[in-house]
Amino acid sequence: MNIKSLLLGSAAALVAASGAQAADAIVAPEPEAVEYVRVCDAYGAGYFYIPGTETCLRVHGYVRYDVKGGDDVYSGTDRNGWDKGARFALMFNTNSETELGTLGTYTQLRFNYTSNNSRHDGQYGDFSDDRDVADGGVSTGTDLQFAYITLGGFKVGIDESEFHTFTGYLGDVINDDVVAAGSYRTGKIAYTFTGGNGFSAVIALEQGGEDVDNDYTIDGYMPHVVGGLKYAGGWGSIAGVVAYDSVIEEWATKVRGDVNITDRFSVWLQGAYSSAATPNQNYGQWGGDWAVWGGAKFIAPEKATFNLQAAHDDWGKTAVTANVAYQLVPGFTITPEVSYTKFGGEWKDTVAEDNAWGGIVRFQRSF
């Protein structure tokens, strides 16, 4: 009996000790739920919330390859072979809502590669570092093409001039600015007012742009100034801009009208005038006092879009371009284009040939 009592007592003690240890044990917390990427559909397709924030981000871009032949319709020179170019563009948009309106950013990085015909007959070209790619050779480069901040109607940063953007650029062709319509990329501070009845207005202070041969940036504290008015409706739109070049103290203006004939066919016409009859300026870069551009677009029922543009300026340059943008599959478009330029009047003395025919085929994958 004593042994039996001892065994029962030992078992009871072990059970009691085990219960006490269980009561004192540390309970591990449940793992936190993983925060997966959430889709943000407030600003269109492709946006998602940055984890831990209410900011929506979109990452997109394109890869492009161009093959050019025939004449250079900008300069009138014969390429004597194929010119090729590739570009990878990477774009980032962010948007979030604040008490002052939508706060957004946009940036675009461009990685470019150009391989032009050597222009040497029967021998390889000179690809030295000091040789201009326009004379033949290989060129690579990386550009921060856009980087700006928006808050409501306010915009500040690197963008393209309101002299282009507010009126809607030119036509949907690759060689659209053979008759030039002004500089593009610029640092700027701009404000756009958008009314609820289709009316909008813009005012911008701009630093000015540059191209291969010229620098049109300001030379002091006084910026270039651009102002514009626009009205848009279901039928189309009409817009006008006036720009003041603070370096040469001259002004230029453009007026553009777009009309939607049907939901697939549209036409547009733009006229421009400059108080300084010279292309060597930031805005009125056409030849002479005035220039005119016009074009049409037809969206075919299937996968093709047809574009046509013609332009003429006061000095006698005439440029005509047509293309077909064919979407082979969603996101991949092939665009063959043909262009013609007639260098007449005062332009004849600036080019080797009066007539230039050129062609280009563009392959572009957008994502």
Curated annotation (Swiss-Prot):
- Is Ion transport one of the keywords? yes
Question: Would you tell me the Gene Ontology cellular component terms?
Answer: cell outer membrane; pore complex
Signal peptide interval: 1-22
One GO process term, biological-process aspect? monoatomic ion transport
Question: How is this protein situated with respect to the membrane?
Answer: Multi-pass membrane protein
What is the annotated localization of this protein?
Cell outer membrane
Instruction: Please verify whether the record's keywords include Transmembrane.
Output: yes
Q: Which SUPFAM superfamilies match?
A: Porins (SSF56935)
Please tell me where this protein is predominantly located: membrane
**Gene Ontology MF terms:** porin activity
Keywords, sorted A to Z: Cell outer membrane, Ion transport, Membrane, Porin, Signal, Transmembrane, Transmembrane beta strand, Transport
Q: Which domain of life is it from?
A: Bacteria
Give the free-text miscellaneous remark of the entry.
Answer: The pore formed by Omp2a is larger than the one formed by Omp2b. Omp2b pores have optimal permeability to allow growth and protection against harmful compounds. The larger pore formed by Omp2a may be advantageous for intracellular growth, when the bacterium is competing with the host cell for nutrients whose concentration is particularly low within the phagosome.
Q: How does it assemble?
A: Monomer.
Role description: Forms passive diffusion pores that allow small molecular weight hydrophilic materials across the outer membrane.
Q: Of which family is this protein a member?
A: Belongs to the alphaproteobacteria porin family.
Q: What is known of its domains?
A: Consists of 16-stranded beta-barrel sheets, with large surface-exposed loops, that form a transmembrane pore at the center of each barrel. The pore is partially ocluded by a peptide loop that folds into the pore lumen.
Q: What is this protein called?
A: Porin Omp2a
List the source organism.
Answer: Brucella melitensis biotype 1 (strain ATCC 23456 / CCUG 17765 / NCTC 10094 / 16M)
Q: Which gene encodes it?
A: omp2a
